[in-house]
Amino acid sequence: PMEDPKSLSGMKLWLDASDLTSAGSSWTDKSGNGNDATKNGSPTLVANAQNTHSIIRYTGNNADYHEWSDINDIRTIFWVVKANSSNQGFLLGDDSQYHFHHNQVFWHSGHSSSNVRNGSLCVNGQSINGLSTQMNSSLANLSIVSLRTTGNVEASRFSRDRNSGGRNWNGD
């Protein structure tokens, strides 16, 4: 059985598309912290997309993303995502920081946060080097991505990079 998100110590945010019946204006945070995500643009809900569970689909359009209040002490993140081959989006974005900056590989060697670059990154349980592993081909199928950072990082969006165009998630 699935854990009650509120029982997990230190949980800041839990967005679970399988709970959704529509891509409404807000996405409820299951952590109990009230970090609900506001929909911007037209991300869509795809019902029964994976083992009867719903997903949210993003087109890569500059207006399509979800945003919540800044969380600036992020240490461990889990995603279930799929990237389309044309994806230019970050795994997480922010209104002012670019800690999750990529450059075709998971992490940009100069622009991503050293706390992200030096962290422990896994895709489907396999440890990978985020500085040399191609992101889009690694995430061509729905995948579980985990990251444990070496220090605090900040994010407030999935997934839009500050106000830079062409850096929104394209995939699920």
For each feature predicted by the language model, list its residue ranges.
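Extracellular/lumenal carbohydrate-interaction signature centered on repeated Trp-anchored short motifs
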Residues: 5-11, 65-77, 133-143, 167-172
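Extracellular carbohydrate-recognition regions
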Residues: 2-31
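Active-site-proximal beta-strand/loop segments in catalytic clefts of secreted hydrolases
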Residues: 16-18, 82, 95, 148-150, ...
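Carbohydrate-binding surfaces in secreted/extracellular proteins
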Residues: 121-130, 135-166
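Short, flexible coil/linker segments at or flanking structured domains
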Residues: 2-3, 44-46, 135, 165
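Acidic/proline-rich low-complexity IDRs
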Residues: 7, 12, 19, 44, ...
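Extracellular glycan-recognition modules
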Residues: 22-27, 31-120, 153-156, 167-168
